[in-house]
């Protein structure tokens, strides 16, 4: 199977926080990456630091920020799915799975990255991951692409075990930082603090730009 990475996440900036290193490493190998972003994050509370957005302008700003971040990561196949922020958990399960199945069948990925259902903390994260997995369960097990997931709950290792995919992303840390910077409304204040902590070599913050970890989804059929 030809290599092709498909990232399916609910919000602009989810990809930059959690998957930018993986994306950049694959693009450096000239492996195509498709990013399907379910919403524009238009219900987000952050409006820049200092404020430069408002509730009316935020959707278009976040759309452009997403486009800018994808340019930083060299993603040339960005698909905006047009779902409403903070509503994914209320959508019909099969309807969401239909959307994910259509993308998967079109892209024919060798690798899918999404949130691990039940370990996304945010309801949209879990609903997105659940929809992807539901779509994949419709396929024969041997026809499912490799699927790795982000898990950000505090009990993730207790429930899932240790992450089995650990990527060294130090060589693309600058790309990850620039992708995060692109999401200005969401990250400016945080990045100022982060960069100060990085200067002081605070270990917890430094690991953000040293490695990304994922869990291979465990099928139960």
Swiss-Prot record:
Entry's transmembrane regions: none
Cofactor(s) required, per the database record: Zn(2+)
Effect of inactivating the gene: Mutant has normal levels of bacillithiol, but bshB1/bshB2 double mutant does not produce bacillithiol.
Keyword DNA-binding: no
Catalytic activity: (S)-malyl N-acetyl-alpha-D-glucosaminide + H2O = (S)-malyl alpha-D-glucosaminide + acetate
Residues involved in Zn(2+) binding: 11, 14, 125
E.C. number(s) listed in UniProt: 3.5.1.-
Alphabetical UniProt keywords: Hydrolase, Metal-binding, Zinc
GO MF annotation terms: hydrolase activity, acting on carbon-nitrogen (but not peptide) bonds, in linear amides; metal ion binding
InterPro entries cross-referenced by the UniProt entry: BshB2, GlcNAc_PI_deacetylase-related, LmbE-like_dom_sf
A Pfam family assignment: PIG-L
SUPFAM superfamilies the record matches: LmbE-like (SSF102588)
Keyword ATP-binding: no
Function summary: Involved in bacillithiol (BSH) biosynthesis. Catalyzes the second step of the pathway, the deacetylation of N-acetylglucosaminylmalate (GlcNAc-Mal) to glucosamine malate (GlcN-Mal).
Family: Belongs to the PIGL family.
NCBIfam families per UniProt: thiol_BshB2 (TIGR04000)
Protein name (Swiss-Prot/TrEMBL): Probable N-acetyl-alpha-D-glucosaminyl L-malate deacetylase 2
Organism: Bacillus subtilis (strain 168)
